[in-house]
Amino acid sequence: MKKLFLITVTILFVTSIVAQEKFVVREITDTQKHSRMVGQANGIILNLISYAISQGNSVEEVAKFTGDQFKTGWNKENGWEGFAKGCLNNWAIFIPNNKLVILEQSETMLKFQSKTPYVWLKNNGPQYNVSYDEYMTFLKINHKIIAEYLGADISFKEVEDGIILTVKKK
């Protein structure tokens, strides 16, 4: 009887080990998903810049090309105000746990502060042969082209604890 019990338990034990799945889909929080997707987006931006440079183009050229592509996705009828609202949304989303602060606003201007974008790159140096300064050059030019298309101007000022963006109606 003990033998039968021992054999049964052994078979159940071995079966449970063999039946375990090698891969499982783990639960991921929305915060983790968001952070991962921002990382993926930044990686794609860096890879785009790196590829453009490897093909003899400058960061400025690839930023202009990208801005020209992206600008037509914005509703031109929403003008500078649509751009300002879009910037608020995009900057709130593009940096995990970002808390935007509106510093000033009027009928023709919006000034807000954001956390530093892609702080890992800033603190750890080049990735995919792209520096933080090149990354920021790309973002600034890209934004300026879209702003112009929508009748706005945008400026960036890096400060100790983030970046200040000023959007003005032209």
PLM feature spans:
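Sec/Tat signal peptide C-region and signal peptidase I cleavage site
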Residues: 15-19
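N-terminal accessory segment detector
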Residues: 20-138, 148, 153-170
